[in-house]
Amino acid sequence: MKSRPEIVILLSTYNGDKYLVEQLESLLRQSYSNFIIIIRDDGSSDETQKIITDYVTRNRNKIYSLPFDQSNIGPSASFCLLMQYALEEKESFGFSRIYMMLCDQDDIWMERKIEIQVSEMLSAEQE
C-alpha cells in the first residue's frame, strides 16, 4: 500500500450518553490510525453533548463536532449533513481523497475494524 487511505468516521448521536463513551473509546483504540471522527448531535437532552465536548477537547486532532443547534432532524438527514461537511472540509483536515464510514452511537468497533475494512476496499478496487 503506497499511501494509507484517509478515513472519516461519521457519527450521528441522539440521547446516547449511556453508550457514547464506550463507542468513542472503541474508535480511539483502532489499529488503523489515519482517520478522524466527525460527530453531529441531533438535539440530545441528556449528557451526550457534554460527552462529545469532552472528547473533542481531549482529542483535538482526531475528533471534531458540528456545532450544537438543538434541532432534531433524524438520523438520515443528520448523516447527510455529516457527509456534506466531510466533503466540503476534507482539505482543512489535511485530506485529499476520503473514504467515509458511518457509525451508530451504540456500536462498539473491534480494534481492527478499520484496518480490515480498508484492506478489503483496496482489494476490491484492484479487481
Residue ranges and their predicted role:
Residues 1-127:
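Nucleotide-sugar donor-binding/catalytic module of glycosyltransferases
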